[in-house]
């Protein structure tokens, strides 16, 4: 994935019928980067963390309606340790409801590899940090960039007090050598091995999608997605 991604996530929600006068749209900015991938942790701390802070604190200070999502307890810990002044600004914006703690884990989880206990502890340590530092808790599993999601995920999430899950990675199944099975649904309820259920966005679309500056009010594509699920909602990366 890119070294740093600024995603615009838009959620279009219709009360019952998808029509222009009953649609509500939320545009929320989000930054996502791996703690380490084709770079080391030191580079994340030295370069990617301050870029995320500088860009988004500027936008928060400039535009009163700007809101921002960011995930990963370990990244917040780095902010606290290496950028304490900006960290205090983050805490203020969290109190104001403009900086949202996304996800609930200490760092991005790979549900294909760890044991159930390691997955649960990842949530436990992340939530403990968020409660101690910000007085809030995450409500979801946020994994835009993971290569598979086991049937145990809804069960672990539900037993951890979480209510949601989202990803864009299932669209990779349509690429060569990744299989041809279809994505189960865009938005709906995902039931785990023990019958526990959470709200799930199975297809948030590619996080490098380009918006062509078009009016989406009458988009048949978005209408079809909204009408295909009981919430009449669309969750889409731009």
What annotation goes with each model-predicted range?
Residues 20-238:
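Catalytic-domain carbohydrate-binding cleft regions of carbohydrate-active enzymes
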Residues 4-15:
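Sec-dependent N-terminal signal peptides
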């Amino acid at each position: 994935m890119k070294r740093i991604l600024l995603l615009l996530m838009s959620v279009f929600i219709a009360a019952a019928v998808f029509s222009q006068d009953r649609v509500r749209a939320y545009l929320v900015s989000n930054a996502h980067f791996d703690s380490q991938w084709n770079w080391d942790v030191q580079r994340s701390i030295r370069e990617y963390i301050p870029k995320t802070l500088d860009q988004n604190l500027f936008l928060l200070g400039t535009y009163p309606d700007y809101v921002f999502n960011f995930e990963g307890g370990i990244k917040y810990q780095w902010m606290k340790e290496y950028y304490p002044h900006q960290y205090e600004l983050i805490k203020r914006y969290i109190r104001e409801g403009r900086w949202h703690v996304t996800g609930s884990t200490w760092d991005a989880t790979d549900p294909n590899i760890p044991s159930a206990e390691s997955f649960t502890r990842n949530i436990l340590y992340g939530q403990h940090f968020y409660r101690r530092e910000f007085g809030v808790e995450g409500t979801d599993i946020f994994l835009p960039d993971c290569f598979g999601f086991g049937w145990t995920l809804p069960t672990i999430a539900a037993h951890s007090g979480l209510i949601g899950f989202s990803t864009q990675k299932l669209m990779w199944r349509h690429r060569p050598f990744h299989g041809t099975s279809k994505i189960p649904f865009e938005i709906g309820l995902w039931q785990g091995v023990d019958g526990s259920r959470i709200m799930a966005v199975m297809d948030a679309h590619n996080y490098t999608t380009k918006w062509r500056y078009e009016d989406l009010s009458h988009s048949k594509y978005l209408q079809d997605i909204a009408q295909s699920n009981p919430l009449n909602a669309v969750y889409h990366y731009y």
